[in-house]
C-alpha cells in the first residue's frame, strides 16, 4: 500500500470557493503577482452577467444587443470552455490553454485572473508568470497541477528509497535509470 486512505471528514476535492474566494476583493488586485483583473468591454461584461453559476452561456437567453460580437458584428459563438461560469461549491474543470480561454469567475462578471487560474492549478502565490498575457494564459493552461507532481514525486521517492524490489521490477523499470 503506497498511499494513505483519506479521513472521513476530508472532502475528495477542494472547491473553487476554497481556492480563490479570498482573491475576489478589489483590495487584493496587485497584492499578488499576476492578479490584475482582465479589462473586458461593457458588452462582454454584460454578457457575462447572463451566465449562471456552474453553467455555460446560453446564447438564446441573451438580449439581442448581446448576441453579436462587439468588434465583428457577427453572431457570438458559444465556446463552452470560455463562456463558462465556475461553480463555487464544486472543483474547477480543466483550465484550457489559450488566449482569453479562462473561465468566468463564479461571482464577478469577468474571467479569472492569471493568479486565480494558477491557484486552481495549485501554484504557490509566490510563483510569477512572465510575458504577455497570452503567454501567461498558455503557461497556466499547459501546466501540470503542482500538487499532483509533488505527490507523484513523493511516492516515487518513497518507493525507490525504501521499497524497491529489483526482483519484482518490470522489464521497463529494469531498463530505466531506476535500476543499474
Report residues per predicted region.
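C-terminal target-recognition/interaction regions appended to catalytic cores
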Residues: 26, 30-180
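Flexible, glycine-/basic-rich loop-and-beta segments that form/coincide
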Residues: 1-34
Amino acid at each position: 500500500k503506497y498511499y494513505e486512505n483519506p479521513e472521513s471528514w476530508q472532502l475528495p476535492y477542494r472547491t473553487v470557493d476554497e481556492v480563490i474566494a479570498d482573491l475576489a476583493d478589489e483590495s487584493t488586485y496587485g497584492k499578488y503577482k499576476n492578479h490584475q483583473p482582465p479589462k473586458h468591454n461593457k458588452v462582454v461584461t454584460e454578457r457575462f452577467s447572463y451566465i449562471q453559476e456552474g453553467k455555460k452561456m446560453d446564447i438564446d437567453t441573451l438580449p439581442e444587443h448581446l448576441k453579436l460580437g462587439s468588434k465583428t458584428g457577427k453572431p457570438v459563438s458559444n465556446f463552452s470552455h470560455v463562456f463558462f461560469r465556475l461553480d463555487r461549491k464544486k472543483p474547477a474543470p480543466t483550465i484550457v490553454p489559450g488566449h482569453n480561454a479562462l473561465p468566468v469567475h463564479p461571482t464577478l462578471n469577468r474571467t479569472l485572473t492569471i493568479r486565480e487560474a494558477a491557484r486552481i492549478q495549485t501554484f504557490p502565490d509566490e510563483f510569477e508568470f512572465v510575458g504577455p498575457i497570452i503567454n501567461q494564459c498558455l503557461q497556466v493552461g499547459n501546466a501540470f497541477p503542482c500538487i499532483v507532481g509533488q505527490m507523484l514525486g513523493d511516492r516515487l521517492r518513497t518507493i525507490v528509497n525504501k521499497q524497491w524490489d529489483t526482483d519484482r521490477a518490470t522489464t521497463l523499470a529494469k531498463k530505466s535509470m531506476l535500476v543499474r
